Regions:
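Conserved beta/loop motifs at nucleotide-recognition and modification sites
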Residues: 1-170
Length: 170
């Protein structure tokens, strides 16, 4: 796949045609949380407590992530593994290589969501550049940038209109 836009992500969620990997980062906290919530809710519809493990990346190992990914879904079609703030670059080159291999071998019944809330992704650094490139090759990368003023006006106007309220742009 590749780096995708907000519209492409929302279309995947609507059509329920998911990638095996979502790599979500960026400066807009609201968008990151919104996308993760929408993905998780849409992927796992049965027994979320069993099919949607949440892993705190600060205390996680690649082995733990791998173990969760390779478990089969229980009484559900899909399993969603959510990993927050896993700083693989700080773990070293060997961990980066292992993670890249893991990205390429995610089972069809599992969706891995890696979201970075406090870990800063600097694509200029070679470690993160390789990880983002591998994520892009094997799944979807979403960079949650702040919206421009024009985009915000359009978003808020549309949001209000759906709720029966009209907002004047002046």
């Amino acid at each position: 796949m590749a780096e995708i836009t907000e519209q492409e992500l929302l279309q995947q969620i609507k059509s329920k045609k998911f990638s095996s990997l979502y790599f979500i980062y960026g400066e807009d906290v609201y968008l990151r949380q919104k996308y993760v919530q929408k993905l998780c809710k849409s992927i796992v519809t049965e027994l979320p407590e069993m099919n949607m493990p949440k892993i705190d990346g600060k205390n996680a190992t690649l082995q733990r992530i791998s173990d969760e990914i390779y478990q089969i879904p229980l009484m559900s079609d899909m399993r969603c593994v959510l990993v927050e703030d896993f700083d693989v670059v700080a773990a070293g080159k060997e961990s980066i290589d292992e993670l890249e291999l893991l990205f390429a071998d995610i089972p069809e019944t599992t969706v891995l969501i890696m979201v970075f809330n406090s870990v800063v992704i600097d694509k200029k650094k070679s470690g993160w550049n390789g990880v983002v490139r591998s994520a892009s090759k094997n799944g979807c990368v979403i960079d949650c940038k702040y919206k421009t003023d024009g985009e915000l006006v359009k978003y808020i106007t549309t949001w209000a209109k759906r709720r029966g309220v009209v907002i004047d742009n002046s």
